[in-house]
């Protein structure tokens, strides 16, 4: 695992960066990878976690599946996963896990989510509280944009970022 800005093990990072009340953990640019996220998913200190920032951590679908299956991290309101390696399978794991039923903010900017991942988010019966969704610089294309535009789940969405995600002019009109 490449750790250019971090030499600490994830256990130490939790102690350093978990807010005093235990609701916010900011580990952006710590390069914890899937192994680190698997540790977080089992970490009892994170029982009250509401905001998790894992931007730029070399996380793949494997790590997202661990988070989706966590019996500890079940109350997240904000999930930052920008600039990782998450594909449709990771988006589907988020869309299908009751752990994310309180989410009002998801940042998946600059990952590898395609139309199937966008469709999974759009059709999720779990992500009903979502207010902000960032799928910019992925590859959702017109098909994914259409699913997002027609979604009943995302009816309360206030912000949708999808620039640089492979939409044609026709796809943009759907939104």
Where are these regions (language model features)?
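C-terminal capping region of solenoid repeat domains
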Residues: 1-7, 11-16, 22, 132, ...
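Short, solvent-exposed loop/turn at the beta-strand->alpha-helix junction
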Residues: 5-10, 30-38, 58-65, 85-92, ...
């Amino acid at each position: 695992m490449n750790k250019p800005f971090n030499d600490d093990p994830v256990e130490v990072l939790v102690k350093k960066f978990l807010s005093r009340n235990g609701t916010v953990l900011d580990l952006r640019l710590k390069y914890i990878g899937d192994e680190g996220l698997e540790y977080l998913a089992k970490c009892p200190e994170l029982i009250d976690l509401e905001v998790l920032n894992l931007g730029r951590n070399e996380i793949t679908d494997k790590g997202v599946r661990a988070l989706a299956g966590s019996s500890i991290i079940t109350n997240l309101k904000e999930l930052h996963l920008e600039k990782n390696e998450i594909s449709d399978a990771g988006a589907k794991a988020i869309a299908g896990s009751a752990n994310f039923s309180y989410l009002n903010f998801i940042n998946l900017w600059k990952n590898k989510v395609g139309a199937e991942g966008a469709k999974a988010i759009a059709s999720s019966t779990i992500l009903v509280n979502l207010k902000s969704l960032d799928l910019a610089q992925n590859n959702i294309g017109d098909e994914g944009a259409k699913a997002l535009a027609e979604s009943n789940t995302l009816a309360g969405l206030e912000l949708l970022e999808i620039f640089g995600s492979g939409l044609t002019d026709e796809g943009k009109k759907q939104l």
